[in-house]
């Protein structure tokens, strides 16, 4: 972890935001002013596929708002009935934007599509494993069957630099395609244990699913599978390992031994040639020049021409770039105690709820391998009492820092060795049950694990099993691995900062909040998440759980809720029931009075297809707040988009003291906000000060999108609020990559998915005793 002093230099804003230009990764596409189409009514979109197949090659077919639009691609073919119209591109940009998705592939016939929409293809000359192995001086007969190839995606998107002026751009993104071509038999003969690894079809036919399942065993010429998608066994020549980073790591570390790290570092250098700021910017420039060489044919006598780079600026009528005010961390209810940096403020003022925190003498269960007792006791002493003045990063200790009276550790040794990989979870749970039988009430748990145990599958993982047991008893837990316990003091002091914050939050404490708008009576920010529960990746039938986290406008955590498990068809009803109950409880708790102005902001990461969650929660809010003046906003906050922002004025920082390498070059400052459309903003939440390595890829911004039915429509306010909520993660002193409304929901979903595999697990207590706890941190 970087020293806390480095965090104190964050969020420079140079140059002045009004003059700032942010270069995008896209190019404007010049299109005809209008096109001739045939339009007919088609209320049922399920019939589009049939029509598209019938007209393929002659007509481009696009469904929009209950109507089917036909654009002639070439003469001949089947006839089309409907109304002939001339439509203006500026008013209907979605038609040619959709056509561009197909036309880009047709314009680049030398590149085979690995994905149709957006058109995605692989570099033809560059393969990075071979280059990395050469740079590292490594060789192995199977290395050339491991491939890492740059992958380009071209995404046509509509953007609106000024209200009423819509344009279409093509945005370039670059990823990496990992592939393992080696035969399973060769890998097996090289000593690689393939059991449990995912395999895919070596040759995939149209309409076939690529994933086959996981390897149970290989005998004769057959691969025996479990968690299979279809067949329980396949011929060994028809399958290959999935090109995942996990499979790469398992295979290459086995093949290369201690030299694997050398290859990994060299591969990191190779990938940086495409993904760090200046290199990415140059790759995008070259792609734009390539695309601009000739027109892109859209239809009969209709072409598109790739033009200039799209730049967001504040020139002319456009006001597309601004810098949000710095986030202030707040440590009391009046707002008088505030600081620019979380740890500095916490050290100076103590936690936000220090005067009202109820449990000043918490009892914490500590579960640990008995052979590590001395080392664990030293760690606990440093955590509780501090490390002294020589280690200013954690000199005080948890008790003084949080204003507690004392902390009592209830020690629970477990007779287990790191070599015990099958029965460790049983021994942990048995030790806990024996200890708690006569230990009295405990308020939190610390579970210490050997590194080997922490990496075990969930069905044998001691941490997941102990978490299941203790959560059922209403006790939140914190995991600590032995390498963390054994850290050198100069590193341990910063780790203990994060550990103390998360532990206090799990005890229902509030370390800090943020400054917020106090002009209204009440403001709630509601995070909405979704957990898809299944036994494995290959299981077809899914069950869903709605996850809700509720915060006050200042970021105070109010409560969490996990809905009942349901089938896909019942998800709408489950959300309606859950949200109505939550809002009714908060209305009573916050004492909403008739005539009060109450703002409710919903954050979602990825709305479920064919379920209009926004309409459901708006309906619930109107019902519960019928006596109040309700302002509602439904905001989607996502990293899943093709937009990148580049600040060419940013020269970056030294990667480390005395280094000539620089990190964060071309990264926009934290809080830079760029308009993409009337209801959309790009929000930079990273910065050179938060980037750790010179090879770290240029960070992508968050896309903040406001639902058009929202009654509160200040998108810039909502983008700033999303920024503030990235500063509310109580897992670290540093901001998170996403707002905690999203981050916490994702964390809960991940843990629910893992806990699902534990026998007798029940989430009931999460809505009762742990309703106000951040048990998931």
From Swiss-Prot:
Annotated region (N-terminal domain), positions in chain: 1-107
Binding site residues for Mg(2+): 777
Cross-referenced SMART domains: Piwi (SM00950)
Residue ranges constituting the Piwi domain according to the UniProt record: 445-757
Region PAZ domain, residue ranges: 183-243
A GO biological process held by the record: clearance of foreign intracellular DNA
InterPro entries the record matches: Piwi, RNaseH-like_sf, RNaseH_sf
Record-linked SUPFAM superfamilies: Ribonuclease H-like
CDD domains tied to this protein: Piwi_piwi-like_ProArk
Cofactor comment: Mg(2+) contributes to binding the 5'-end of the gRNA.
Region (Linker L1): 108-182
Cofactor: Mg(2+)
Domain of life: Bacteria
Job description of the protein: A catalytically inactive argonaute protein. Binds 5'-phosphorylated RNA as the guide (gRNA) and short DNA as target DNA (tDNA); does not bind other nucleic acid combinations, does not bind tDNA alone. Has highest affinity for gRNA that begins with 5'-phospho-U and poor affinity for gRNA with 5'-OH. Upon expression in E.coli, plasmid sequences are found in RsAgo, its induction leads to plasmid degradation and suppression of genes encoded on foreign plasmids, suggesting it may also interfere with transcription. Does not interact with preformed gRNA:tDNA duplexes.
Family membership noted in the UniProt record: Belongs to the argonaute family. Long pAgo subfamily.
Free-text comment about domains: Has 4 domains (N-terminal, PAZ, Mid and PIWI). The N-terminal and PAZ domains are joined by linker L1, the PAZ and Mid domains are joined by linker L2. The domains assemble in 2 lobes; the PAZ lobe consists of the N-terminal, L1, PAZ and L2 domains, while the PIWI lobe has the Mid and PIWI domains. The PIWI domain assumes an RNase H fold but in this bacteria does not have catalytic activities. The gRNA:tDNA duplex lies between the 2 lobes.
Protein name from the UniProt record: Protein argonaute
Gene behind the chain: ago
């Amino acid at each position: 972890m970087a020293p806390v002093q480095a965090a104190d230099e964050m969020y420079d804003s140079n140059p002045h935001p009004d003059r700032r230009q942010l270069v995008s990764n896209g190019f404007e596409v010049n299109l005809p002013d209008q096109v001739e189409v045939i339009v007919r009514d088609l209320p049922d979109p399920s019939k589009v596929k049939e029509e598209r197949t019938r007209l393929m090659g002659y007509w481009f077919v696009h469904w929009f708002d209950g109507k089917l639009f036909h654009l002639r691609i070439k003469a001949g073919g089947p006839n089309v009935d409907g109304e002939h119209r001339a439509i203006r591109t500026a008013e209907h940009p979605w038609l040619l934007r959709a056509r561009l998705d197909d036309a880009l592939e047709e314009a680049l016939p030398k590149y085979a599509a690995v994905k149709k929409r957006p058109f995605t293809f692989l570099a033809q000359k560059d393969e990075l494993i071979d280059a990395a192995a050469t740079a590292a001086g490594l060789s192995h007969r199977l290395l050339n069957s491991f491939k890492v190839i740059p992958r380009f995606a071209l995404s046509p998107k509509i953007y609106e630099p000024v209200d009423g002026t819509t344009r279409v751009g093509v945005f370039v993104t670059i990823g990496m395609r990992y592939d393992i071509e080696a035969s399973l038999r060769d890998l097996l003969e090289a000593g690689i244990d393939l059991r449990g690894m995912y395999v895919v079809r070596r040759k995939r036919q149209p309409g076939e699913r690529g994933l086959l399942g996981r390897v149970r065993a290989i005998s004769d010429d057959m691969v025996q599978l479990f968690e299979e998608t279809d067949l329980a066994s396949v011929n060994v020549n028809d399958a290959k390992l999935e090109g995942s980073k996990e499979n790469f790591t398992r295979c290459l570390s086995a093949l290369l031994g201690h030299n694997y790290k050398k290859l990994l570092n060299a591969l990191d250098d190779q990938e940086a040639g495409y993904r760090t700021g200046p290199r990415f910017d140059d790759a995008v420039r070259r792609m734009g020049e390539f695309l601009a060489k000739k027109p892109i044919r859209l239809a009969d006598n209709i072409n598109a021409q790739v033009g200039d780079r799209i730049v967001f600026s504040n020139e002319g009528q456009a006001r597309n770039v601004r810098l949000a005010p710095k986030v202030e961390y707040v440590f009391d209810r009046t707002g008088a105690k505030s600081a620019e940096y979380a740890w500095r403020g916490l050290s100076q003022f103590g936690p936000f709820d220090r005067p009202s925190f109820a449990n000043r003498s918490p009892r914490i269960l500590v579960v640990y391998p008995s052979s590590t007792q001395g080392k664990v006791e030293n760690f606990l002493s440093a955590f509780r009492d501090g490390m002294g003045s020589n280690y200013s990063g954690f000199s005080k200790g948890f008790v003084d820092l949080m204003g507690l009276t004392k902390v009592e550790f209830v020690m629970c040794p477990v007779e287990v060795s790191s070599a015990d990989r099958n029965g460790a979870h049983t021994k942990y749970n048995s030790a806990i049950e024996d200890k708690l039988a006569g230990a009295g009430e405990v308020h939190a748990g610390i579970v210490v694990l050997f590194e080997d145990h922490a990496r075990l599958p969930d069905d044998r993982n001691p941490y997941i099993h102990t978490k299941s047991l203790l959560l059922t008893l209403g006790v939140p837990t914190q995991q600590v691995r032995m390498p963390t316990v054994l850290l050198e003091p100069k590193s341990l002091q910063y780790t203990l900062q994060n550990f103390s914050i998360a532990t206090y939050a799990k005890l229902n404490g509030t370390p800090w909040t943020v400054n917020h708008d106090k002009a209204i009576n009440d403001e709630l920010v509601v995070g909405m998440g979704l957990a898809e529960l299944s036994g494995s990746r290959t299981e077809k039938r899914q069950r869903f759980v709605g996850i809700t986290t509720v915060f006050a406008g200042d970021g105070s955590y109010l409560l969490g809720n996990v809905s009942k498990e349901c089938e896909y068809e019942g998800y709408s009803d489950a959300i309606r029931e859950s949200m109505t109950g939550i809002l009714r409880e908060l209305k009573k708790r916050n004492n909403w009075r008739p005539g009060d102005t109450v703002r409710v902001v919903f954050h979602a990461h990825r709305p479920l297809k064919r379920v209009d969650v926004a309409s459901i929660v708006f309906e619930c809010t109107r019902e519960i707040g019928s006596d109040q003046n309700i302002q509602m906003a439904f905001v989607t906050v996502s990293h899943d988009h093709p937009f990148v922002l580049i600040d060419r004025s940013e020269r970056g920082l030294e990667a480390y003291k005395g280094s000539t390498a620089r990190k964060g070059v071309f990264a926009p400052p934290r809080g830079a906000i760029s308009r993409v459309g009337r209801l959309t903003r790009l929000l930079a939440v990273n910065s050179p000060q938060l980037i750790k390595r010179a090879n770290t890829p240029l960070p992508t911004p968050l896309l903040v999108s406001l639902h058009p039915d929202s009654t509160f429509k200040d998108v810039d306010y909502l983008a700033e609020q999303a920024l503030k909520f990235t500063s509310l993660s109580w897992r670290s002193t540093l901001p998170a990559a996403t707002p905690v409304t999203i981050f916490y929901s994702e964390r809960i979903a991940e843990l629910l998915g893992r806990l699902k595999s534990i026998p007798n697990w029940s989430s009931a207590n999460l809505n009762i005793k742990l309703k106000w706890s951040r048990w998931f941190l």
